[in-house]
Amino acid sequence: MLFRSRVFRKVWEMACWAGFLAGRESARLMLPHGQGNIFFTGATASLRGGSGFAAFASAKFGLRAVAQSMARELGPQNIHVAHLIIDSGVDTAWVRERREQLWGKEALNNPDLLMPPASVAASFWQLYQQPRSAWTFELEIRPFGEKW
């Protein structure tokens, strides 16, 4: 917890407050139509904190609570709210560069440690296509090589 309160607040604003605002405004537009979908993206930190990740974990825990509260409030109004926990990095150029900086080129050798964006999108699409008789609130996805 050796960081400034300003950093903690900024992380919370980006990872929790922004999600609340986006969800609120989305719901406001969907309610008159009597249907819709609002999906929040979580992370491993949505379920457990880690050393050095107090700000991020508290924000992701918070976003999960926002999503759950919105699901209970908006579900009866035919708006599907779900929280998707991504327990891994998503395979993008930025993530690959960051992994290489932190752990060297060998960090990129195992293709089973990052999720392709198309795989993540397929999970969101699966949620979107669900009939309301079997809505999922929370879905946790991870690549084959991720330890849990």
Regions found by a protein language model. Give the residues of each.
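Catalytic Tyr-X3-Lys loop
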Residues: 4-20, 39, 63
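Catalytic loop of short-chain dehydrogenase/reductase
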Residues: 37-62, 68, 72-75, 90
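C-terminal helical subdomain
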Residues: 76-79, 83-88, 102-148
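Active-site loop of short-chain dehydrogenase/reductase
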Residues: 8, 30-43, 76-79
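Conserved catalytic-core motifs of eukaryotic protein kinase domains, centered on the activation segment
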Residues: 33, 50-51, 95
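Short-chain dehydrogenase/reductase
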Residues: 12, 16, 52-61, 113-114
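Amphipathic alpha-helical dimer-interface segment in Rossmann-like NAD(P)H-dependent oxidoreductases
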Residues: 14-32
